[in-house]
Amino acid sequence: MYDYIKGQLTKITAKYIVVEANGLGYMINVANPYSFTDSVNQLVTIYLHQVIREDAHLLFGFHTKDEKDVFLKLISVSGIGPTTALAIVAVDDNEGLVNAIDNSDIKYLMKFPKIGKKTAQQMVLDLAGKFVEAPQETGNTKARSNKAGNTQLDEAIEALLALGYKATELKKIRAFFEGTSETAEQYIKSALKLLMKG
């Protein structure tokens, strides 16, 4: 098992990043790949969780230990796999997640992709009181204005689709942001907040 990787960030896609270490390129699934844009071709440290399946060995990566801790707690819940957990971690307001669990707010939890009533109830049952404190905001929140525009919005929509959000939901998101100029990372952060508001 891996705890973290330190290497050069060489590639960003809508679903994953690639970090090169010791001559090998590691494909790492992350919640918001575009939050790493400022670190391309730079040395990065990514906290890791490895999932071994019969057909694949998958790596899931995180900016911080807190983010990884939230992910690990989520995948301990019956009915939540790593992809769904990653989609939940993608939402900046992890404090909202913790509050919803501790206050048995099933309706809020059901706003996450692939989380139905039964799984939301299981989250409350398994995780209530397990978070000592709400994790800090994750990722790089520094605003960037380069490469803004429709291409950035397209990349954000693609990343949200990869997290499990429905195309019908994202049509409204696209319409909401048309004509604006942000980075893909900023679009994703704003879109996730809108999606959680319903």
Swiss-Prot record:
Residues 143-147 are annotated as: Flexible linker. Gene3D superfamilies: 5' to 3' exonuclease, C-terminal subdomain, DNA helicase RuvA subunit, C-terminal domain, Nucleic acid-binding proteins. Residues 148-198 are annotated as: Domain III. It comes from the Bacteria. Residues 1-63 are annotated as: Domain I. GO terms for cellular component: cytoplasm; Holliday junction helicase complex; Holliday junction resolvase complex. One of its GO terms (biological process) is DNA repair. SMART domains: HhH1. Residues 64-142 are annotated as: Domain II. Its main location: cytoplasm. Keywords: Cytoplasm, DNA damage, DNA recombination, DNA repair, DNA-binding. GO terms for molecular function: ATP binding; four-way junction DNA binding; four-way junction helicase activity. It is found in: Cytoplasm. Belongs to the RuvA family. NCBIfam families: ruvA. Homotetramer. Forms an RuvA(8)-RuvB(12)-Holliday junction (HJ) complex. HJ DNA is sandwiched between 2 RuvA tetramers; dsDNA enters through RuvA and exits via RuvB. An RuvB hexamer assembles on each DNA strand where it exits the tetramer. Each RuvB hexamer is contacted by two RuvA subunits (via domain III) on 2 adjacent RuvB subunits; this complex drives branch migration. In the full resolvosome a probable DNA-RuvA(4)-RuvB(12)-RuvC(2) complex forms which resolves the HJ. Has three domains with a flexible linker between the domains II and III and assumes an 'L' shape. Domain III is highly mobile and contacts RuvB. The RuvA-RuvB-RuvC complex processes Holliday junction (HJ) DNA during genetic recombination and DNA repair, while the RuvA-RuvB complex plays an important role in the rescue of blocked DNA replication forks via replication fork reversal (RFR). RuvA specifically binds to HJ cruciform DNA, conferring on it an open structure. The RuvB hexamer acts as an ATP-dependent pump, pulling dsDNA into and through the RuvAB complex. HJ branch migration allows RuvC to scan DNA until it finds its consensus sequence, where it cleaves and resolves the cruciform DNA. This is Holliday junction branch migration complex subunit RuvA. The gene is ruvA.
